[in-house]
């Protein structure tokens, strides 16, 4: 995180005889972070298992994977396992709006209907924390999910969407 701040405190003391004395106390904090990291705040990264050979997919393909319209990765062939955050999280709301193009009720109805008709055995897996999402994806070869871009670690791979990664101009998966 980028933190640049300067705190200046001016102290003026007036004594009983009317003479004045002044003092200045300065506290300077400078910390730098990569500009790309700072620009990722508020963006979501689509993450996959490191063994997945894919590096880039279109938004339409991403939607097909998330909607369980494609059950296996191409190329690679691993079974797709979508991981979602729990209802009410801003990350989940953003994904429902931007990728699924539905609200929570529509999402629930969609997957219940797929299960009822036998098209799908189970829907997206739910995880209650970012570390849990990352851990699941790092262990399951076909897993795909999302986390805040500034919380990604080296145990997973960030998937480019439409040729763009978080922090690049035009990247559209944001909170």
Model-derived segments and spans:
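Positively charged n-region of N-terminal signal peptides that target proteins for export
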Residues: 1-4
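Bacterial N-terminal signal peptides
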Residues: 6-15
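Signal peptide cleavage region of secreted peptide precursors
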Residues: 19-21
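Exported/periplasmic ABC-transporter solute-binding proteins
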Residues: 24-175
């Amino acid at each position: 995180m980028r933190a640049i701040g300067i705190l200046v405190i001016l102290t003026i003391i007036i004594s009983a005889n009317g003479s004045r004395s002044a003092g200045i106390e300065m506290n300077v904090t400078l910390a730098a972070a990569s500009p790309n990291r700072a620009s990722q705040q508020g963006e979501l990264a689509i993450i996959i298992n490191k063994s997945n050979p894919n590096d880039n997919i279109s938004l339409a393909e991403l939607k097909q994977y998330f909607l369980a319209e494609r059950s296996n990765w191409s190329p690679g062939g691993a079974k797709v396992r979508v991981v979602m955050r729990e209802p009410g999280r801003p990350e989940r709301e953003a994904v429902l709006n931007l990728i699924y193009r539905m609200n929570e009720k529509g999402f629930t109805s969609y997957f219940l209907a797929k299960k009822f008709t036998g098209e799908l055995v189970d829907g997206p897996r739910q995880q209650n924390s970012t570390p849990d999402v990352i851990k699941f994806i790092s262990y399951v070869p076909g897993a795909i999910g999302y986390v805040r871009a500034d919380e990604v670690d080296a145990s997973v791979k960030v998937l480019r969407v439409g040729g763009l990664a978080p922090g690049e101009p035009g990247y559209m998966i944001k909170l």
